[in-house]
Amino acid sequence: MWALVESNSISKIYARPTAITIGFVAATYYTAEDEAANSEHVEGTLKTPRQGTNYPKNIFELWTEAELKAIGIYSITIDNSNLKDEQYYQNTSITYTYNSSPDTVTGAYGTATAKSLTDVLYTATDESNGLGTEGEIKTRGLKPRKKETINNQAYSLLEDSDWLVLRAAEGGTAVPSDWTTWRAAVRTKANSMCTQIDNAADVDALAALFTYTHTDPDDLSSPQTRPLGEWPDQPS
């Protein structure tokens, strides 16, 4: 990503290489008033020519940083220190700044806003403005969404062995004990996970439940675990 700096100010951002014109000034043409004042200035004829230098897009790849700077093109250094996980935070747009010393252009995010842990509902004002019905869900909260994901995972895990339960309920072979134990363990684990989610004090605590870390921080080959835990292994 690059910025065009003119008169110590950023005038344009380039997200990708593109053909550019530096120092562009549009051509001007004589008007009827010009012609009335001087008959030699015929309306519609060229008054001042177009100005500027055209450059092909490949200069962004072929030129050195110094060569690009010489025509006002600066490579942008992005500061991601305020960038948060978009699953849990609403990030700001990037603010670009030209720094006269040391003659660089940087881009930085502002302070991210944590998303709501609970459902956000439409208000009476929202309803009067035609945005939605008061009391209905406007935006799903992080906790309800996470718990929904957990319950869906539990449903998917149990689904493949539901036929064992149905067969037993209709007078067929009893469900093998290891499967009965496992299915109960899945439901118990789902409830435990949902309780952990409910108990998260804030967004960072919620995110931490799902974050995997090495059991030995100094050994990147060591197993990874997360506070939320894992589903029980299915019987073989």
Question: Where are the predicted features?
Answer:
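Helix-centric, low-specificity signal for extended rod-like, repetitive segments
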Residues: 160, 175-176, 180, 219
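Interaction-interface detector
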Residues: 1-159, 191-236
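Short capping loops/turns at secondary-structure boundaries
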Residues: 143, 147, 168-175, 179
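Secondary-structure edge/capping motif, primarily at the C-terminal ends of alpha-helices
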Residues: 161-172, 193
